[in-house]
Regions:
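Glycine-enriched alpha-helix->loop->beta-strand junction motifs that scaffold or abut catalytic
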Residues: 154-159, 175-180, 199-202, 227-229, ...
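Distinct, well-ordered alpha-helical segments
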Residues: 30-33, 57-58, 149-155, 248
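Active-site metal-binding loops of divalent metal-dependent hydrolases
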Residues: 49, 143, 234-236
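Divalent-metal coordination cores built from histidine and acidic residues
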Residues: 1-137, 170-172, 177-198
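His/Asp/Glu-enriched, well-ordered alpha-helical/loop segment
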Residues: 134-138, 203-204, 212-278
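Structural recognition of alpha->loop->beta junctions
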Residues: 150-170, 250-261
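Short catalytic-loop micro-motif centered on adjacent basic/acidic residues
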Residues: 15-21, 138-141, 158-161, 233
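Short acidic active-site motifs
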Residues: 88, 147-148, 169-170, 219
Length: 278
C-alpha cells in the first residue's frame, strides 16, 4: 500500500493524468485517497482483484501448499462455474471496482507452468460480462493464447490485454466485435530482457518470459496493420512505474505514427474507458 502511493505520484509526474488499473485490490483504496486529495496521483479506474479460475493466472494461492492455500472462492476472485462468476463480479463491485478484469489464459509471471492455455469456459465469461453490464461495468481480458482470446471476444469482453499469440481468426473476431487491443509492449520487452539474467525469475517463469515476451511487438504490428482498435497500455508493475511513456517509442518502432500513438493514449483510451465525454 505504501509503495502504491509512490507509484501513483511517479505516474502523474510522468505525464499520465488518468490510468486504468487491472488487478490490484489495494488500488480501489488508493483511488479513493487520490479523489479525496489525501494522495497525489492520477485519476484511477480500478478493476480491483482480477478474476481467475482455480490454479489460473490470478489465483492468489498459486505456489502455496494445499495446507496453507485452502480453497479460495469468489470472495477471493477465484471462480469455477457460472454461479461463482456472477458472485465474483458482484464482490468486486461491492469492493469498489470500476470495471472487471479476467485472466482468460495463463500468464507469464504466475507460478504455473502454462502461460497460454484457456482458463475460463465461454459460459463463465458470458456470465461475467452479463453481470458486469448489470452494474454498468465492462470486462478486460488478460490473454496470451488464441483460444482463450476467442472465447473472451465471443463472450463480449471490451478489451484484450497483451494478446501475444493472437492468430488471424482472433484478429477477425476482434474487428467483428469491435474489441479493443491493449498491447503492453513495454511488459514484453521488460520480461524478455530480465529472462536473460540467471535466477531473476523462478524456474517455472523463466521459459515463459523468454518465449512470450519478445513476441508482443510482432503481434502489435499484425494487429495494427489489420485495423484492430488499439488503446495504449503498459502493464506497469511488470515494467517500472513512471516509465509509461516508453510504450510510445515501442509502438512507433513497430509502425504506428507518432500522432496515432498519442491518439491511442488519449481519444481511443477514453472510449475504452467510456469516458470520451470527459
Amino acid at each position: 500500500a505504501y509503495r502504491s502511493v509512490s507509484y501513483a505520484e511517479k505516474t502523474l509526474l510522468a505525464g499520465f493524468t488518468t490510468v486504468r488499473d487491472l488487478g490490484g485490490p489495494v488500488n480501489t483504496s488508493l483511488k479513493k485517497s487520490i479523489n479525496k486529495g489525501w494522495v497525489v496521483g492520477p485519476r484511477i479506474f480500478s478493476a480491483g482483484k482480477a478474476l481467475a479460475s482455480t490454479g489460473g493466472h490470478a489465483d492468489p494461492t498459486n505456489g502455496m501448499s494445499f495446507e496453507l492455500a485452502g480453497d479460495p472462492g469468489p470472495k477471493q476472485g477465484v471462480v469455477n462455474g457460472v454461479a461463482d462468476s456472477r458472485k465474483a463480479v458482484r464482490q468486486q463491485y461491492k469492493n469498489g471496482a470500476d470495471l472487471i478484469k479476467i485472466t482468460a489464459t495463463g500468464g507469464v509471471l504466475s507460478v504455473a507452468k502454462n502461460g497460454e492455455n484457456p482458463q475460463f469456459s465461454e459460459d463463465e465469461i458470458l456470465e461475467i460480462v452479463k453481470t458486469a453490464s448489470d452494474y454498468n461495468m465492462h470486462v478486460a481480458a488478460h490473454a496470451h493464447g488464441a483460444e482463450g482470446m476467442k472465447r473472451a471476444i465471443r463472450a463480449g469482453v471490451k478489451s484484450i490485454e497483451h494478446g501475444t499469440l493472437m492468430d488471424d481468426e482472433t484478429i477477425e473476431l476482434m474487428k467483428k466485435f469491435g474489441t479493443f487491443y491493449v498491447p503492453t509492449i513495454s511488459a514484453g520487452e521488460f520480461v524478455a530482457e530480465k529472462a536473460k539474467i540467471d535466477g531473476y525469475y523462478p524456474d517455472v517463469v523463466q521459459p515463459k518470459a523468454a518465449k512470450i515476451g519478445p513476441q508482443l511487438k510482432n503481434t502489435f504490428k499484425k494487429a495494427y496493420n489489420a485495423g484492430v482498435k488499439i488503446a495504449f497500455g503498459t502493464d506497469a508493475g511488470v515494467s517500472y512505474h513512471g516509465e509509461n511513456a516508453k510504450e510510445f517509442r515501442y509502438m512507433i518502432d513497430a509502425g504506428m505514427s507518432p500522432m496515432e500513438a498519442i491518439f491511442s493514449a488519449t481519444k481511443t483510451a477514453s472510449i475504452l474507458l467510456g469516458e470520451e465525454k470527459n
